[in-house]
Amino acid sequence: MPVRKQDTQRALHLLEEYRSKLSQTEDRQLRSSIERVINIFQSNLFQALIDIQEFYEVTLLDNPKCIDRSKPSEPIQPVNTWEISSLPSSTVTSETLPSSLSPSVEKYRYQDEDTPPQEHISPQITNEVIGPELVHVSEKNLSEIENVHGFVSHSHISPIKPTEAVLPSPPTVPVIPVLPVPAENTVILPTIPQANPPPVLVNTDSLETPTYVNGTDADYEYEEITLERGNSGLGFSIAGGTDNPHIGDDSSIFITKIITGGAAAQDGRLRVNDCILRVNEVDVRDVTHSKAVEALKEAGSIVRLYVKRRKPVSEKIMEIKLIKGPKGLGFSIAGGVGNQHIPGDNSIYVTKIIEGGAAHKDGKLQIGDKLLAVNNVCLEEVTHEEAVTALKNTSDFVYLKVAKPTSMYMNDGYAPPDITNSSSQPVDNHVSPSSFLGQTPASPARYSPVSKAVLGDDEITREPRKVVLHRGSTGLGFNIVGGEDGEGIFISFILAGGPADLSGELRKGDRIISVNSVDLRAASHEQAAAALKNAGQAVTIVAQYRPEEYSRFEAKIHDLREQMMNSSISSGSGSLRTSQKRSLYVRALFDYDKTKDSGLPSQGLNFKFGDILHVINASDDEWWQARQVTPDGESDEVGVIPSKRRVEKKERARLKTVKFNSKTRDKGEIPDDMGSKGLKHVTSNASDSESSYRGQEEYVLSYEPVNQQEVNYTRPVIILGPMKDRINDDLISEFPDKFGSCVPHTTRPKRDYEVDGRDYHFVTSREQMEKDIQEHKFIEAGQYNNHLYGTSVQSVREVAEKGKHCILDVSGNAIKRLQIAQLYPISIFIKPKSMENIMEMNKRLTEEQARKTFERAMKLEQEFTEHFTAIVQGDTLEDIYNQVKQIIEEQSGSYIWVPAKEKL
């Protein structure tokens, strides 16, 4: 039966009629599928195919209508007949094709230094193109993010290499001659002449119904964006791919960051969370992350992006009343004029809800909400500082006008967008009584039936209560004090993550009445400790909350410790005196929490690894007096810290001790039971029991003496630990004017398109390079394919003297070599919290791979801890990245602290 255009039009009409009747929610998927078919019917491609079919059946097969039978037939006659037909006869060439579909005359391929070029098109891409997927996501972690133009260390990019593309020969069969588009099956023939024909959605006739994670195709819009590559690249970062999905199992390629001043930002159309479908003519749906990056690298100077994004969401306006509490309003904000939280949007957004604060208790305000007004003060088109001031200048009763996203986001299972403007420092502000800088809110107690932060003292029962704990690897997880003159046994400390903390039933200030029916009301400290030690795995404790008695007891302990400290300092019996050392500055090589040290004789001083301390009184063997040194100068606060001798003695005792609860701590962490001999009768750890044995003394990290030194160069940066490559890439892409990489040396012969001094320093003499390595002129070197490769001290120095941080992808051994060369690097170790933490940041890792990564990190820490400038930890890569940026900024001054030659 011949195909007629009017039949197609009738079918289209019937489909549209049927679609209009599908108004129920359950019909949404069917309606979406019908819309796809309608779009196909209405496309230029489909109409062209109908025209061809009709022309073939009606005109070519019915020769009498257009051919004189008296003339001999010619093989080319059908083509001639088609050319004089009444159909549109505009020639389809690269000039008349829409710009969006015209292929480039030249193709460019990326040639890696030592690996063969990969294929342009992913093996997954066939004629049957799978529909793209897109979910609305927040920028939750940088772990899967690859920057389009960020390259570090030895990953040098060779210049693009043009190769001529061969165009197909004209067709010799009776079909419409069209210029094929690579990786697509597209035929373009307008049914009516158009001066500027619109771009046609490629392969609309073969698109399958996509498996949308959130929403249908009706929820999305499509756009073609043409960018001209600038000096700093395309100016955006991507994440995702089949090998490392950005969100869940969605393998789409997402835009995760728009770099201010880059090509994408100047164009203004590309947005964070856009999904890239094609780069020029390369389909990047359902491809690996590296394939997408390769497509962007090879795209040339003019890059056409076909993107898909979720349609703008409507907002619901509501008013929220909050009553200020001890923690203020209890939320953080970001955004404002000049400090956009989301590119192109000056609004003020809620970025964090602080546990136990007013907003948390009220429950209505959520992350991602937009603040429109506070009381009568409008917060639209205001600066960040103005918004903070308005929120701080409120009374106890605060009325917030907020715009909430509709349920389109609420049903996603992912948080609304929380995107940090890449061009500025993070400036989240907590709206609390005295906080202008962002602080990380305490994580909720996951296993506690009621969050302890929400309950006030008045809400906790004062009656005796029974608590059952199961002893874990950290014992019972609390410390006790008391037991003198029948004053009672009190809980003085709850170990985070221990059985007591996870139960949520015990708290500091509880008096222990009994343990497994053993009455402790009049027990001594030793009797209470023995009862807890011998209680077995399941321990039943009767406790009573007595905060007033505990406060009086604490005051008494404080007075005793003050007397001891004054007596100790006045006796001056220590081996290290301030009279012997005029000024003593040290760098801490461990974290110290004064609340975990029950032996402090006076007010303690908290510090963390890498902090600089000015020891102003080192005359005592056990305790020093010190103040912290910050980038802004010395702190006024003076506190007590454990001496080097005390730290090492306690740590060695811990390493030589067999503990009944197999208690373990991280290397360099101060034991919780650090106490003074004079107070032994009033404090102990409820889960410690020591049986010492003799063993070889271990090297213990405590303090490193340092001197301040002026530098006239920009310090190199070495990042070690899991996900370091992602962090390095992001630093270079976000701050191309502040970070760079040095040119390595190699004995490999130069290739035709390479430039000496740009791609590599090509060394003609292997013997000379080996000699330079022996003379320590290289911070790191190795051999690959019988060629030497290495990074020289001079190459690093050249980058440093240009005012850029040289990003180095090297081992920990390079830190010491740079220090010897008087190039003191900023060395940062990313310490994973656990195997699960690693797998969360890189979802494609197997459990075995995560275990090996974790073990490598622990070995790295053990081997190079004393050489690290700082150690960072975080739940997400975004947290870690922000910490790294802050550390680099703090360490970038003209005066730095370097290891001193003298020893403690």
UniProtKB/Swiss-Prot annotation:
* Cysteine disulfide partners in this protein: none
Segment Interaction with SH3 domains: which positions? 162-212
Principal location: membrane
> Which terms in the Gene Ontology molecular function aspect does this entry carry?
cadherin binding; cytoskeletal protein binding; guanylate kinase activity; ionotropic glutamate receptor binding; kinase binding; L27 domain binding; molecular adaptor activity; phosphatase binding
- Carrying Phosphoserine, the residues are S122, S138, S158, S232, S568, S573, S575, S579, S598, S619, S684, S687, S834
Q: Where is this region: Required for interaction with MARCHF2?
A: 224-546
Q: Membrane spanning segments where?
A: none
Which PROSITE patterns does the protein's record reference? GUANYLATE_KINASE_1, GUANYLATE_KINASE_2, L27, PDZ, SH3
Start-end of Polar residues biased regions: 682-693
User: What residues bear Phosphothreonine in this entry?
Assistant: T115
PDZ domain segment(s):
224-310, 319-405, 466-546
* Biological process according to GO: actin filament organization; actin filament polymerization; amyloid precursor protein metabolic process; astral microtubule organization; bicellular tight junction assembly; branching involved in ureteric bud morphogenesis; cell-cell adhesion; chemical synaptic transmission
What positions does the domain SH3 occupy? 581-651
Membrane topology value: Peripheral membrane protein
Q: Which UniProt keywords apply?
A: Cell junction, Cell membrane, Cytoplasm, Endoplasmic reticulum, Host-virus interaction, Membrane, Phosphoprotein, Repeat, SH3 domain, Synapse, Ubl conjugation
- SMART domains of this UniProt entry? GuKc (SM00072), L27 (SM00569), MAGUK_N_PEST (SM01277), PDZ (SM00228), SH3 (SM00326)
Source domain of life? Eukaryota
Query: Phosphotyrosine is carried by which residues?
Result: Y399
The family this protein is said to belong to = Belongs to the MAGUK family.
Its quaternary organisation is: Homotetramer. Interacts (via guanylate kinase-like domain) with DLGAP1, DLGAP2, DLGAP3, DLGAP4 and MAP1A. Interacts (via guanylate kinase-like domain) with KIF13B. May interact with HTR2A. Interacts (via PDZ domains) with GRIA1. Interacts (via PDZ domains) with GRIN2A. Interacts (via PDZ domains) with KCND2 and KCND3. Interacts (via PDZ domains) with KCNA1, KCNA2, KCNA3 and KCNA4. Interacts (via PDZ domains) with ADGRA3. Interacts with KCNF1. Interacts with CAMK2. Interacts with cytoskeleton-associated protein EPB41. Interacts with cytoskeleton-associated protein EZR. (Microbial infection) Interacts with HTLV-1 protein Tax.
**Function of the molecule:** Essential multidomain scaffolding protein required for normal development. Recruits channels, receptors and signaling molecules to discrete plasma membrane domains in polarized cells. Promotes epithelial cell layer barrier function via maintaining cell-cell adhesion. May also play a role in adherens junction assembly, signal transduction, cell proliferation, synaptogenesis and lymphocyte activation. Regulates the excitability of cardiac myocytes by modulating the functional expression of Kv4 channels. Functional regulator of Kv1.5 channel.
Instruction: Please give the name of this protein.
Output: Disks large homolog 1
| Naturally occurring in which organism (per UniProt) | Homo sapiens (Human)
What gene makes this protein? DLG1
